[in-house]
């Protein structure tokens, strides 16, 4: 590629709305341009990196037995109504009517469409297993698109869907996809972790997320540095922090706590550790034809409620936060002084595992400016329903028993699910088993955010000059920077010779023949992040030398002219082989 025949849209300044490094650099490097909120043009530099991500994904999906197809972005509402997600998905699902007033959606995922394919095309277990995949544009109407491609509304995604005759087959398909994802993200040159996760709106049972580790990541990941354990904080099991409950040493006492509505303030006033206070979270669930049920969830004062865990408890699937009016009616006091003792109406109490093993703890007295100290289970309160309802924290014991947890931030770039028969049962996707009886097919789904990978890679690989691409997804592998290409015949001849040698070797090279000043050339290519740079100048040629610098190198080195091409070819191939 010659730069004079390519489009290079670099900018000196980032747009004012760009908040994170990847968004700023993708705009400045001429990779993307905003069309509307969360919707971008992918300019030639950006598209080259996208195509390289897609190529690696395609190779590994094919290697794992995936079969590529292409499904429509526009999907009829009938399919979503069959699965039940038409009502459940929420405002992120972009819905519209055609001229015949028929309802359609722009697909955020394709479970319904692929299940429709399977039920019409797969009739016997002998046709299984099968794994269909596509690389397709998706749309989710995010309420607040931000961070460039990291949380856009329109994005490119690889989504795959496996169909098996039984759970053993599904587990094998899942394992193959998990292994394929490890290979994909390794080849992409990313520092990543596979973590146990919640299935969210997709549904199903087993699930893992693949996260690129970055300080700007939206997700918190709990991991054990001394073992292989890793899980999204939403899914990580929180073990009780006390092995057993200590015997009471205090009498229950109503204690003045004027103006102290928060656990931290109560602990400071009473001169006790925050860990001895109890945080009361009040939820409500609807009952058809009757008053809502009020729930009190008890957490240690320094812990936070995990709403996903809470929603999985019997009776809490559709919970909401109780209103202030409901709280006052039930407890006789506004939020801030609530507790399980002396409520005006019956409530259901759930204690976190750690709270269930506490003694001599402090709860609200259900009276403004008062808390009750020295509270104990059995003596002062009936034994509670006990459940894991909190987020893990740094320093908690690892669920695998092999150390303590640490917390880092991650950017989700891939997700694999064992769906089971959630969609096949709802949509009648059955096949005949060995006995000739119809049974719903076991499904898995497996997604990779192709465009999000670019942003995630940049969040891990940048400096004050610009992007530092992993070799495998750089828009170009090598840039040739001739000094005075339009003025010096010797420089032009050597640059053209090097260019031809690199092209013949299959190297993705760009020759900057624009005639720009050295400072402009270097700034552009450092911003774009090309991994290898060769500078050709009259002075160096007279000495038989060319200047080489890797994008991660602090200093340039001199190479003999006759060795330069093979040296750079070797560096590129070695980097790609890692």
Curated annotation (Swiss-Prot):
It comes from the Bacteria. PROSITE patterns: AA_TRNA_LIGASE_II. It is an enzyme of class 6 (ligase). Keywords: Aminoacyl-tRNA synthetase, ATP-binding, Cytoplasm, Ligase, Nucleotide-binding, Protein biosynthesis. Its EC number is 6.1.1.15. Gene3D superfamilies: Anticodon-binding domain, Bira Bifunctional Protein, Domain 2, YbaK/aminoacyl-tRNA synthetase-associated domain. GO terms for cellular component: cytosol. It is found in: Cytoplasm. InterPro entries: aa-tRNA-synt_IIb, aa-tRNA-synth_II, aa-tRNA-synth_II/BPL/LPL, Anticodon-bd, Anticodon-bd_dom_sf, Pro-tRNA-ligase_IIa, Pro-tRNA-synth_IIa_bac-type, Pro-tRNA-Synthase_IIa_type1. It catalyses: tRNA(Pro) + L-proline + ATP = L-prolyl-tRNA(Pro) + AMP + diphosphate. Its main location: cytoplasm. The keyword Transmembrane helix does not apply. GO terms for molecular function: aminoacyl-tRNA deacylase activity; ATP binding; proline-tRNA ligase activity. The keyword Methyltransferase does not apply. Signal peptide: none annotated. Coiled coil: none annotated. GO terms for biological process: prolyl-tRNA aminoacylation. Catalyzes the attachment of proline to tRNA(Pro) in a two-step reaction: proline is first activated by ATP to form Pro-AMP and then transferred to the acceptor end of tRNA(Pro). As ProRS can inadvertently accommodate and process non-cognate amino acids such as alanine and cysteine, to avoid such errors it has two additional distinct editing activities against alanine. One activity is designated as 'pretransfer' editing and involves the tRNA(Pro)-independent hydrolysis of activated Ala-AMP. HAMAP family: Pro_tRNA_synth_type1 (MF_01569). Homodimer. Belongs to the class-II aminoacyl-tRNA synthetase family. ProS type 1 subfamily. NCBIfam families: PRK09194.1 (NF006625), proS_fam_II (TIGR00409). Consists of three domains: the N-terminal catalytic domain, the editing domain and the C-terminal anticodon-binding domain. This is Proline--tRNA ligase. It comes from Paraburkholderia phytofirmans (strain DSM 17436 / LMG 22146 / PsJN) (Burkholderia phytofirmans). The lineage of its organism: Bacteria, Pseudomonadati, Pseudomonadota, Betaproteobacteria, Burkholderiales.
